[in-house]
Amino acid sequence: MRAAGLVLARAIVAGRGVVAAGVSTMEVNDAIAAVIADAGATSNFLHYGARGADPGFPATICASVNSEIVHGIPSATRILATGDLLSIDAGCILDGWHADSAVSVHVGEAPSMEEVDLIAACELAMWAGIATAGPDGRLGDLSWAIQNSVEQSARQDGRRYGSVAGYGGHGIGTAMHMAPFVPNQGKRGKGPRLIPGMALAVEPMITLGRPATRELGDGWTVVTKDGSRAAHAEHSIAITEDGVSVLTAADAGAAGLARFGVVPVPLD
């Protein structure tokens, strides 16, 4: 899984590298798809959910813009503009093992500090959750840490952040979506134990308004009901006997976990 995670880490960097005003979300998709293919991996998003005549999800990434939270479909006609908030979610399979990761970025300069703070709060919540993950902990500890971080950021920033429920993280390994579901709200000491060998995708989604969502007519794109902008952050992690390792971060999560005093377990 670490090998798949490193491929995806490089792909996400490539996708971020082409984000600019005047670029289509399909161009971001294609940049990520090229890195995945060059590594001998395949996308686990493309044709996800296919059944019979239904081809499933039509792209390598989810490209969600502004009020789109998750599962946005890339398009050659969806042209990014300065100030847009783009969430890139992608995954790959290498040698039968899956990886899944997401990042939110602004196109050019952010239109306001509240949007800068939104992305920072979402990323911090992800890292707070990951920092609690270790052998003999419980899933509720991780979920509570995400929720608590969002609430703390809201107080610190003087803003309302909506923590999206109903969408969240998941187990990952020989399939992209496996048990358990990883909610972004929870209670400490509750839920299944985190045991060595377990792999999870940790992915908070927060909004600048209320957390209520709706799905668009394409059957995929999830947006905020109130039209507020949203951010999404995600890494795939592994629980080991000695702690946690971030599979989809080139540094195994060292930079993100440092502020929590956590040193990730190297798997390279």
Whereabouts are the PLM-identified features?
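Active-site neighborhoods and metal-handling regions in enzymes and metal-associated proteins
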Residues: 2-268
